Swiss-Prot record:
Its EC number is 1.1.1.86. Pathway: Amino-acid biosynthesis; L-isoleucine biosynthesis; L-isoleucine from 2-oxobutanoate: step 2/4; Amino-acid biosynthesis; L-valine biosynthesis; L-valine from pyruvate: step 2/4. This is Ketol-acid reductoisomerase (NADP(+)). It holds the Pfam family KARI_C. The gene is ilvC. It comes from Staphylococcus aureus (strain NCTC 8325 / PS 47). Substrate binds at S251.
Amino acid sequence: MTTVYYDQDVKTDALQGKKIAVVGYGSQGHAHAQNLKDNGYDVVIGIRPGRSFDKAKEDGFDVFPVAEAVKQADVIMVLLPDEIQGDVYKNEIEPNLEKHNALAFAHGFNIHFGVIQPPADVDVFLVAPKGPGHLVRRTFVEGSAVPSLFGIQQGASGQARNIALSYAKGIGATRAGVIETTFKEETETDLFGEQAVLCGGVSKLIQSGFETLVEAGYQPELAYFEVLHEMKLIVDLMYEGGMENVRYSISNTAEFGDYVSGPRVITPDVKENMKAVLTDIQNGNFSNRFIEDNKNGFKEFYKLREEQHGHQIEKVGRELREMMPFIKSKSIEK
């Protein structure tokens, strides 16, 4: 049964008197740090020199190299990209951990797959907002919040649970609700959602729809409008009220087509393929492939990225977006 915690459920402020080091000052890092600071906590930033280092200073934080930030902290929240966490942990975090420090993450990848293996005498917890950093920050300022997940991997001090919930409250998450989970569940469901649906599944569905229309002789511009541009209209309806809201809002023709043609596209074989994707996540095949490719300079990753960048749908999209000044268009430089 799902357990959800709110402000009133966090009885003890286990962060009181503790120094928090936020390692990283990107999307999640700036939101966590600023929300904690606004709630009165002692926050320092650990980061390497660069734009984010300068931005954190501009925002009024004490900023240090990662090792120095960790040395002075009781709670260390690691908010770096998955692929660099392992090296930063090994070289800058682990040598400076002390007994009963708390090591925290917003995604469980490196803990769950064993890239990072903390010593047994530190707490390890997860607080994972279910939204991007700018939304975590904006909703906090507005007095609301983004729902979040939390979980405990190890509790050496006996206070890991209280610290995790206090941290979740500190970034504002308990205003909306914090769902209890595990590193395993958070990691595997997050990766599956990205690969099978949100990123991999949707991108290939759109691309295949575009190719089907163009190969049948239809204008690429019309194909783009029908399978990519209008996707936002449907996703917004889904976001606001689920599939029922989509079906309530679209025409009867579209709804009928949903029922009779959807199962022809997403067949039982597709679900079996999804299960295979999930299995590769669960057994470590995907993580091993990602980790090894990272060690080899991301040769496979960059090759795949370049292949997708050259697809016709991207060229058509760039041209059509110039006709729509109401869209805040983004061109990704290569």
